[in-house]
C-alpha cells in the first residue's frame, strides 16, 4: 500500500488496455484501397490457399485483410470496407473484408449465413 506522500509525488497510473485492431482507430469499420490481392498458406496443421488482400486504409495504415467466402471479385485498386477479426491460422491477418460493401461483391449462391457474406435472399 502506497503512502499519501508517495501518491502525491507520483499518482496512480491508469491501466492501458491494448487493442487487437489498432488500424481501425476505435471505429467499427474502415475503408481502404487494395494494393495487392493474393493467396497465402496457413500455419500447421492446416493446409489451404487462403485469399487475402493488402489494403491501404484512409488513415494511412497498410494492413492485411482476409477475404471470406467462396470466390471474390477483388483486384488491385478495388475499394473495400474492412472490419476487425483475426484469422487464427494466418499470422499477421487481423482484419476481415466485408462482403457486399463498396467494390467487394457478395457471395453468389449463398443460402445460409447470408448476412455475413452480403448475399441477397434467393428467389424461392
UniProtKB/Swiss-Prot annotation:
> GO: which molecular function terms?
rRNA binding; structural constituent of ribosome; tRNA binding
- GO cellular component terms? small ribosomal subunit
An individual GO BP term: translation
Modification sites for 3-methylthioaspartic acid: 89
The reply to whether Iron figures as a keyword in the UniProt entry is no
* A Pfam family recorded for this sequence: Ribosom_S12_S23
Q: Which keywords does the record carry?
A: Methylation, Ribonucleoprotein, Ribosomal protein, RNA-binding, rRNA-binding, tRNA-binding
Q: Which InterPro entries match?
A: NA-bd_OB-fold (IPR012340), Ribosomal_uS12 (IPR006032), Ribosomal_uS12_bac (IPR005679)
Q: What does the record note on quaternary structure?
A: Part of the 30S ribosomal subunit. Contacts proteins S8 and S17. May interact with IF1 in the 30S initiation complex.
Give the similarity note: Belongs to the universal ribosomal protein uS12 family.
- What is the role of the protein in this entry? With S4 and S5 plays an important role in translational accuracy. Interacts with and stabilizes bases of the 16S rRNA that are involved in tRNA selection in the A site and with the mRNA backbone. Located at the interface of the 30S and 50S subunits, it traverses the body of the 30S subunit contacting proteins on the other side and probably holding the rRNA structure together. The combined cluster of proteins S8, S12 and S17 appears to hold together the shoulder and platform of the 30S subunit.
Protein's UniProt name: Small ribosomal subunit protein uS12
* Naturally occurring in which organism (per UniProt): Shewanella baltica (strain OS185)
Amino acid at each position: 500500500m502506497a503512502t499519501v506522500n508517495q501518491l502525491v509525488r507520483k499518482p496512480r497510473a491508469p491501466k492501458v488496455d491494448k487493442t487487437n485492431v489498432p488500424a481501425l482507430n476505435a471505429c467499427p469499420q474502415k475503408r481502404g484501397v487494395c494494393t495487392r490481392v493474393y493467396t497465402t498458406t496457413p500455419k500447421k496443421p492446416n493446409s489451404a490457399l487462403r485469399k487475402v488482400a493488402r489494403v491501404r486504409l484512409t488513415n494511412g495504415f497498410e494492413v492485411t485483410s482476409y477475404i471470406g467466402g467462396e470466390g471474390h471479385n477483388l483486384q488491385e485498386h478495388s475499394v473495400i470496407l474492412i472490419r476487425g477479426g483475426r484469422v487464427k491460422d494466418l499470422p499477421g491477418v487481423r482484419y476481415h473484408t466485408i462482403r457486399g460493401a463498396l467494390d467487394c461483391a457478395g457471395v453468389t449462391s449463398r443460402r445460409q449465413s447470408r448476412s455475413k457474406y452480403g448475399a441477397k435472399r434467393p428467389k424461392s
